[in-house]
């Protein structure tokens, strides 16, 4: 416990909020252009080929974004929408692409959890 004299000399520091997705600049999403679309491997206990894209945002920041779902139509110069949300087993990937928006098509033949993958409601 600090004494009153110590607190007079140096007041308590308020804890500063540190954003988990700083490139979004406090926006819910951001638009960007894919500069490179590639696959990468996850950290130690897991094994896969995860689809990611390097994206240059409208605020000139370059970020790595994860492309969720099975199959995608993204390539270089595709315009995508980026949201926050990291991928735990991919170091440096702190953003997700929004499927079904701009150039990123929704996941085909998706029946459950469709809203997360931009899939339309199937014709019964």
Swiss-Prot record:
The keyword Ribonucleoprotein applies. It comes from the Bacteria. GO terms for biological process: translation. GO terms for molecular function: rRNA binding; structural constituent of ribosome; tRNA binding. The modification 3-methylthioaspartic acid is found at residue 89. Keywords: Methylation, Ribonucleoprotein, Ribosomal protein, RNA-binding, rRNA-binding, tRNA-binding. It holds the Pfam family Ribosom_S12_S23. CDD domains: Ribosomal_S12 (cd03368). Signal peptide: none annotated. Residues 1-25 are annotated as: Disordered. One of its GO terms (cellular component) is ribosome. InterPro entries: NA-bd_OB-fold, Ribosomal_uS12, Ribosomal_uS12_bac. With S4 and S5 plays an important role in translational accuracy. Belongs to the universal ribosomal protein uS12 family. Part of the 30S ribosomal subunit. Contacts proteins S8 and S17. May interact with IF1 in the 30S initiation complex. This is Small ribosomal subunit protein uS12. The gene is rpsL.
